[in-house]
Curated annotation (Swiss-Prot):
Its job: Bifunctional enzyme that catalyzes the enolization of 2,3-diketo-5-methylthiopentyl-1-phosphate (DK-MTP-1-P) into the intermediate 2-hydroxy-3-keto-5-methylthiopentenyl-1-phosphate (HK-MTPenyl-1-P), which is then dephosphorylated to form the acireductone 1,2-dihydroxy-3-keto-5-methylthiopentene (DHK-MTPene).
Cofactor(s) this protein cannot do without: Mg(2+)
Subunit relationships: Monomer.
Cited NCBIfam families: enolase-ppase
Alphabetical GO biological process terms: L-methionine salvage from methylthioadenosine
UniProt xrefs under HAMAP family: Salvage_MtnC
Keyword Disulfide bond listed: no
Protein name: Enolase-phosphatase E1
GO molecular function: 2,3-diketo-5-methylthiopentyl-1-phosphate enolase activity; 2-hydroxy-3-keto-5-methylthiopentenyl-1-phosphate phosphatase activity; acireductone synthase activity; magnesium ion binding
Amino acid sequence: MIRLVLLDIEGTTLPISFVRDVMFPYAAKALPALMQDHTNPIVVGARADIVMEHPGQDPLKVCQDWMKADVKAAPLKTLQGLTWRQGFEDGTLQADLYPDVPPALKAWSKGGLRLAVYSSGSIPSQKLLYGHTAQGDLTPLFEDFFDLSTGGKKDAASYEKITAAVGLPADEILFLSDIGAELDAAQRAGLSVCQLVREQDGTVPHPGVPQAPDLNAVSTQFGLPVA
C-alpha cells in the first residue's frame, strides 16, 4: 500500500520547456551580478565551494560552463535558487505546472497520502516554485523537500536516506520521475516507482518500470485517490 508519493519536478510535474526556456535563461542573465555580491553569506559560501573544487578558475565561468553542460552541481543550484527567488517573489517568474498536477496532488493529500519532493534544484528553489504557481501556492501539500544535499538522484543510498527520514517501509513510498536512471536507483533501494512519460517533453520510455502519461494514470495504476 502506497502511503507517500515522492515526486521529481522537471519533466514530472513541470514541463521541461519551462525550466529550459524560462528558468535557466533567467538565472544565466542574473548570475553575473549575483556573483559580485560579497555580502551575502550564501553567495560567498557557494563561490568558495567552486574555488575549492576548481582552483585557479573564475567561479562565474565555472558556473556558466556547468549550465551549458547541464551539470547539476550543488553550488550552481544554490546560486540559481537565489536568482529564481527574486524572479518568483517579484512576479517575473510563475511556474505553470502540467494541468493534471494540482488536482492530483490535492486529491492525494485530501485522501491521506503523504507527499514529498526530491529534485536536483535546491530546497528553497523547490519551495519557491511550488509557492508561486499559476494554480496558486501548493507548498502546504508537501511535508518534506529533498535536494542534492541528500545525495545524487542516481544513487540508491539517497533513497535509503529519504526512506529513513520519512519513517516508512521503502515499498510504501512511490517515486515518480521521468529519468530512468533515477527510477533504477530508487528501485534498488526498495521503493515503488513509476516513470512519467510526458508526450510534450519527448520522454523516452525506460524498460523495466511502470509508466504513465500523467498523474491521473498514476492514480489508476496504483490505486491512489483520483482527482
